[in-house]
Design a protein with these regions (language model features):
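Non-catalytic beta-sheet/beta-sandwich ligand-binding modules that flank or precede catalytic cores
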Residues: 21, 25-26, 53-54, 72, ...
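C-terminal accessory/regulatory regions appended to core domains
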Residues: 28-31, 71, 76-82, 106, ...
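Short amphipathic alpha-helical segments
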Residues: 10-12, 102-105, 140-144, 165-167
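Short amphipathic alpha-helical segments embedded in low-complexity Lys/Glu-rich regions
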Residues: 15, 44-46, 136-140, 180
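Amphipathic alpha-helical coiled-coil/heptad-repeat segments
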Residues: 1-28, 148-192
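A short beta-sheet element
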Residues: 55-121, 128-142
Length: 192
């Protein structure tokens, strides 16, 4: 689905698309925002609160806050990426949120014609593994050359494809979590 090293044309492609992809720096694909104005004041989280507090790491949602000032207003119509500046992990966010720390960048697209879900998968496809505990976006990631489809139609098709797969994965993970909770409940009720 993405061109291999040295090639500008992917081996697997949706029907109706042809031609080379264009090489761009990630810093030209994305602009970044420092998250300081969205940092949560209190770490007294409660699941009954409305605003999720995010980290770009594996845990993603740390909890929920009742703070309503300084909320980043992402939405399905205006999604953003959060990029952990130290681990380089990232997530696509389509809902309002606050953040835990300044150790991330909030990424948005430079071009309105680009598709954020396609660009997110390009970012996810970078095979970089951090070796030092240092910030990575400005000095390293923004300088990476990546290949992007030239047309917004192809970007949309790729982004939509991977978003559907991600939605299915999330659905299955929620089902698995409910089954684990059911199992724990049954074990507790049967053996206590």
């Amino acid at each position: 689905m993405f061109p291999k090293n040295g090639s500008k044309v992917p081996e697997i492609r949706f029907a109706g698309f042809s031609g080379e992809w264009e090489q761009r720096k990630l810093g030209d694909v994305f602009k970044y925002e420092q998250p300081q104005r969205y940092i949560v004041n209190s770490t007294e989280y409660d699941d009954s609160y409305d605003v999720p507090v995010l980290t770009a790491g594996k845990s993603f949602i740390l909890g929920y806050t009742n703070e309503t000032i300084g909320v980043k207003n992402a939405s399905p119509e205006s999604p953003v990426l959060i990029f952990d500046d130290f681990t380089t992990s990232s997530h696509c966010v389509e809902f309002p949120f606050k953040v835990k720390s300044s150790a991330m960048k909030i990424l948005t697209l430079n071009r309105e014609s680009d598709n954020i879900h396609c660009a997110f998968n390009v970012l996810q496809n970078i095979g970089y593994v951090p070796v030092n505990h240092e910030r990575h976006w400005i000095s390293i990631f923004s300088e990476f050359n990546v290949l992007m489809p030239k047309t917004s139609d192809e970007q949309e098709r790729i982004g939509s494809f991977f978003k559907k797969i991600e939605n299915l994965i999330n659905l299955q993970q929620r089902k698995a979590e409910k089954l684990k909770q059911f199992k724990q409940s049954m074990l507790h009720n049967m053996f206590v």
